[in-house]
């Protein structure tokens, strides 16, 4: 009858949007509950984005990933203002002493707006010098696990590397390809269970 047909149409009109809504809710719930550290980076398996940056050493030439060609190495994104980096740093210092794997630092957005004098903006040279001075002092106090640390003042290199926040760590192979990315703190357990076995495998190939 017409009434039954009308009821079916109404039910369909109601159920389809409801189904779509529930599907969206489930999708979002899964996404929100998923640890962002476990989400694979689209960069893994691809060449590390090229860059050329000043380092903390004013007398050293600029650095880029191409300078590490032929070596397996780690790139660690850090900053002195990063609270989680303080938790991670002793782990990296101990690791660098016990292993031959070169760790390159990427000093990320070291100079924050509140660091600049009131009513005055740093020139690019002043900004770089401020970053060098504060970072050098911090590394002297906490230990230096890095063979060198490049300075990403404006965070542009961080954008190319898909940096969510600090710290982040990448393992890069002899051909300059990113093989692993970690968002968040590197722990001793992670080094032993994941990073070291990967490094040994890449070094042997």
Kindly give the residue locations of the regions a language model identified.
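Thiol/disulfide oxidoreductase modules built on the thioredoxin-like
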Residues: 14, 140-146, 151-202
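A short beta-strand-turn-helix
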Residues: 51-74
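Feature marks short, surface-exposed loop/turn motifs that line or immediately flank catalytic pockets
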Residues: 51, 81, 109-112
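Conserved beta-strand segments of alpha/beta enzyme cores
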Residues: 47, 102, 147-148
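Short pre-active-site segment immediately N-terminal to redox-active cysteine/selenocysteine motifs
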Residues: 71-73, 77-81, 165
């Amino acid at each position: 009858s017409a009434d039954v047909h009308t009821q079916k149409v109404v039910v369909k009109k109601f159920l389809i949007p409801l189904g779509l809504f529930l599907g969206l809710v489930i999708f979002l719930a899964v996404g929100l509950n998923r640890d962002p550290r476990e989400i694979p980076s689209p960069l893994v398996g691809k060449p590390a984005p090229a860059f050329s940056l000043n380092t903390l050493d004013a007398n050293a030439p600029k650095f880029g990933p191409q300078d590490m060609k032929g070596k397996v190495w780690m790139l660690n994104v850090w900053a002195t203002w990063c609270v989680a980096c303080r938790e991670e740093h002793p782990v990296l210092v101990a690791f660098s002493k016990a292993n031959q794997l070169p760790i390159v630092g990427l000093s990320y957005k070291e100079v924050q707006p509140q660091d600049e004098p009131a009513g005055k903006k740093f020139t690019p040279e002043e900004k770089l010098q401020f970053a060098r001075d504060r970072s050098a002092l911090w590394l002297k106090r906490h230990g230096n696990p890095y063979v060198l640390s490049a300075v990403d003042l404006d965070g542009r290199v961080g954008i190319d590397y898909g940096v969510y926040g600090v710290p982040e760590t990448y393992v890069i192979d002899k051909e300059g390809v990113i093989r692993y990315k970690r968002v968040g703190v590197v722990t001793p357990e992670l080094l032993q269970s994941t990073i070291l076995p990967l490094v040994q495998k890449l070094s042997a190939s």
